[in-house]
Amino acid sequence: MRKKNYKGRCEKQSLEKFTTICKTYDPIQSAYANILVKNKDVAEVRCNVPLDGDECGEYMTDFVCKKTDGDLMVRECISTKLLEKPLSMKLLDMSRTYWLRHSVSDWGIVVDAAEE
């Protein structure tokens, strides 16, 4: 989850199942985009989907996937080192609440591998 007008480094890829060019902003997003392409349960993927509404209008969800059974699946990518930060938790909770209001129950986070 990041701001709509994020100015960081962006990698653009043309991937199967994605409705537009896939723009990823970190290695976690990039790796998960490739996982979604290989997932047989996923029919279509949209990335960096803006959240509508006043309370969350400046942010985007990382991945909104339409599954083969017609249900939606939402995934937010975040580094494990950011998970304990209050703002990160607030944004993730805002995303989860937003998608629950839009009848999406399959919401989850994607984290990088924990370093030992």
Locate each region found by the language model.
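Electrostatic, structured charged patches in enzyme active sites and in nucleic-acid/phosphate-binding
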Residues: 1-116
